[in-house]
Amino acid sequence: AYKAIYQGGLTIKSTQNLQIQKICDEEVADKANYDAGTKYSFYLSFQVKEKDGTIKTYTNQTMLSYYKKKNKSQNYSINFTSEEDCRAAIAQYEKDVLGKGDKLVENSEYIFITMQPQVAMTIMDQSTGEVQAIVGGRGNKAGNRTWNRATKTCRQPGSTFKIIACYAPALDAGGKTLASVQDDAPLTVGNKTYNNYTHKFGGFTSIRKAITKSINIVTVKTLQDIGVDLGYEYAENFGFSTLTDTDRNLGISLGGLTQGVTNLELTAAYAR
């Protein structure tokens, strides 16, 4: 392969659109886009060799627990206003947990500081499915093959999943049309009570209106009509790799999933 690249005329093409990628990078980096202001958090890991030779590992999670217990308060946070404040807090924690005769294990310390809030973005050509731009998070890359929030982080898709797991199968194979009507009224199934975001109900409502207004009750009742298995099957066929059998329930129509989905796969589903 090495010779083919440099001597054999092998050509490697990328789907990336540099102009679109530049716009995405600039917008993600623009602090004016974040109303709450930028905070900094971190992942921390280090080891301490205690006086008796015991090795203990400390992390950002043990740090949270330590100060919540010490301060007798659940309000302690590892979100700070600057990277310098993060490093100062880490240094103080290391000082606090080191007892007399204890030593920090050489080369055991790992600190990765990230900006908050974080962000992920995927831009895809709907006609070809080609990824034209992708953003895996805010901040400077700390190295190659680092964590990419667009391709690896799973989040709850919420109402974006209504089309995927309910209305697409309902219109395509479930015998429904945009003019089909459901009664938008209080709904309890088993021990689960469903509600709308507004906590109001509109009576008989078309699927067309339910989509434009993102009405939960109509969505759940539509999935009841066509069957959960059909909705789950369509979601699988849209290419979601993180679905599990525990997602075979009415909650899938509202995007309530066990693991969630990635930004990349959600974008790809809408580009199909």
Language-model segments: what does each one mean?
Residues 226-243:
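Short, charged, amphipathic alpha-helices and their helix-cap/turn boundaries
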Residues 24, 128-129, 155-182, 210, ...:
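Active-site SXXK
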Residues 5-10, 146-152, 194, 203-204, ...:
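Flexible glycine/proline-enriched surface loops and loop-helix/loop-strand junctions
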Residues 2, 224, 255-259:
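Penicillin-binding protein/beta-lactamase superfamily catalytic region
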